[in-house]
């Protein structure tokens, strides 16, 4: 039982004994820096149940805990806070337990571990990945790692939107303007080549619309009758009919895109266990609609279309099958979800969809329908919704070719890291290859940390220069502290024995207290689907270590026991930084 749990149980006993109340929710937190103490019990919420002043309640609880909990050596009450001082022996004992633990703060996966699916990325195959995809991929991949760290088996998936009019636009533009261009002949990544033709389609389409309007057509008619758009629609019809030439071109251009995506994913450091393709799933779900009709969950209108009425649940009526029997997006999503969980991964308990907040309503509807259809796992579905990412100069559109390209942004981050590192001039003795690797670790670490430190639901204004600062709440600042710790450990040589008794310096206590929070932060990040909690915890730990580093001597300490403890503390902080950053998909350099 942890000290927090011991304090919690004894506080409940004290309240029951003195006030005759059973209170479950008692808030215990680390004592704020300006107060004396280690742990604080917040008294204000207790006033709802106990008719007494907070100071009186604090005195009663403080006296009880000092008497009944050996680790509590003193207490003080400041307004609505009971601050408890904990014995050095407890902190030394606790640190002794975690010092030897590998991957402290995480839970190993076993044969009995529950399983989850995490879906992320899910791009269209008509253009390269952009800045928005970077946030999506980083969130999904990090959540998968965090869930694994809490003992869950995780399957990482994406559904690639590889069919529809948007693909046909790139295909028809390539036929009209491409002159047989390939990634090999142009030296362009395949996704960039296909994206180039998506932009060319849009340019030609706008020119044709303008021409038709000039000839006297209305804007609406011009948009519908523009020859290049008519050709794209005809291509979609041929694809749906299984025309061999159309399918061959579709497969060829999609493969170019997949090859390009693979390079981007590899550079970003994300991966998948299973890919799904919309061309293989878009017919799924019709059997689910039939089942829903039989159950009375869905109803058929006079025109033959199938609907569900969700007005009693505060939502609208929702179409689930068109009158001509063709599916809509929700139909496919119903089919794909049941295929994944009932067939492909039958031991899975739930699924997380990493999708932007513009789809919030869609997922409310999807999850509610699956619950009404009686799927037990539907209650374990979660939409990891996130806000838009913008650059300082505003948002981006892909049809006009002004999108912030993911590959270009990653390269820019590496370039900025190189320029800054050369300014600092601390790379003597590095080979050129080592330097390039370090620039990549710093640049991508800066990008990932800047995005993941923000709560997913908030918008991000991404500033490359700000993200790569070596001071403040940034990836490079944390990486630099990690490298500093590794330097200390190299100079220390063989690890000395860890002392089990002695007095602690206040900075040592603070560091151990900060380390003690890590396991609960990992669990909380999993429970709330927020990698930001881990990012900001690691930053707080690093700030605490730097304060420790500036206020005490580590290698220069003459007392062997104190020197030993400080080396072990440094080592453990380094390990927790590395573990925390690993959960965010960020590398840490041994030297900087």
Question: Model-derived features: where do they sit?
Answer:
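Flexible, low-complexity linker/hinge segments
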Residues: 100-111
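Non-catalytic interaction-recognition regions
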Residues: 1-92, 110-592
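Short, charged, solvent-exposed linker or helix-capping segments at domain edges/interfaces
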Residues: 93-99
């Amino acid at each position: 039982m942890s000290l927090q749990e011991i304090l919690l149980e004894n506080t409940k006993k004290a309240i029951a004994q003195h006030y005759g109340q059973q209170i479950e929710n008692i808030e215990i937190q680390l004592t704020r820096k300006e107060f004396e103490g280690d742990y604080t019990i917040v008294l204000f919420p207790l006033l709802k149940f106990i008719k007494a002043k907070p100071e009186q309640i604090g005195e009663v609880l403080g006296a009880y805990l000092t008497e009944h909990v050996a680790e509590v050596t003193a207490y003080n009450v400041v307004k609505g806070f009971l601050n408890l001082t904990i014995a050095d022996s407890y902190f030394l004992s606790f640190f002794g337990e975690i010092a030897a633990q590998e991957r402290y703060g995480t839970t190993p996966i076993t044969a009995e571990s529950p399983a989850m699916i995490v879906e992320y990325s899910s791009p269209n195959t008509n253009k390269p990945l952009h800045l928005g995809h970077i946030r999506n991929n980083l969130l999904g991949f990090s959540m998968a790692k965090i869930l694994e760290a809490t003992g869950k088996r995780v399957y990482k998936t994406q559904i690639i939107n590889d069919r529809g009019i948007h693909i046909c636009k790139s295909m028809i533009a390539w036929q009209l303007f491409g002159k047989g261009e390939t990634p090999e002949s142009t030296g362009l990544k395949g996704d960039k080549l296909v994206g180039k033709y998506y932009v060319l389609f849009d340019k030609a389409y706008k020119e044709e619309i303008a021409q038709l309007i000039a000839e006297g057509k209305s804007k609406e008619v011009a948009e519908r009758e523009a020859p290049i758009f008519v050709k794209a629609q005809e291509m979609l019809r041929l694809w749906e009919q299984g025309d061999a030439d159309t399918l061959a071109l579709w497969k060829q251009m999609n493969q170019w895109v997949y090859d390009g995506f693979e390079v981007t994913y590899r550079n970003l450091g994300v991966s998948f266990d299973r890919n799904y393709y919309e061309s293989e799933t878009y017919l799924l779900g019709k059997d689910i609609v039939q089942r829903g009709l039989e159950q009375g969950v869905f109803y058929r209108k006079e025109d033959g279309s199938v609907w569900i009425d969700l007005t009693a649940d505060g939502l609208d009526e929702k179409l689930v099958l068109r009158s001509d029997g063709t599916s809509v997006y929700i139909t496919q999503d119903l089919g794909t979800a049941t295929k994944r969980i009932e067939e492909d991964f039958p031991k899975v308990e739930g699924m997380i969809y990493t999708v932007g907040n513009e789809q919030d309503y869609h997922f409310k509807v999807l999850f509610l329908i699956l619950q009404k259809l009686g799927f037990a796992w539907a209650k374990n579905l979660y939409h990891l919704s996130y806000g838009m990412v913008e650059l300082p100069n505003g948002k981006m559109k892909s049809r006009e070719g002004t999108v912030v390209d993911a590959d270009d942004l990653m390269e820019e981050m590496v370039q900025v890291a190189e320029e800054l590192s050369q300014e600092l001039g601390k790379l003597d003795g590095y080979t050129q290859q080592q330097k390039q690797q370090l620039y990549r670790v710093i640049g991508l670490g800066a990008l990932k940390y800047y995005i993941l430190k923000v709560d997913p639901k908030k918008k991000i204004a991404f500033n490359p220069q700000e993200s790569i600062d070596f001071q403040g709440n940034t990836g490079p600042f944390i990486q630099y502290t990690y490298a500093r710790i590794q330097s200390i450990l190299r100079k220390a040589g063989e690890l000395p024995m860890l002392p089990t008794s002695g007095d602690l310096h206040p900075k040592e206590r603070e560091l151990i207290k900060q380390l003690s929070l890590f396991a609960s932060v990992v669990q909380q990040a999993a429970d709330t689907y927020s990698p930001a909690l881990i990012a900001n915890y690691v930053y707080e730990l690093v700030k605490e270590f730097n304060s420790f580093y500036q206020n005490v001597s580590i290698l220069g300490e003459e007392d062997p026991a104190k020197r030993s403890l400080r080396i072990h503390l440094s080592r453990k902080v380094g390990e927790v930084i590395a573990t925390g950053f690993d959960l965010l998909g960020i590398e840490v350099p041994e030297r900087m």
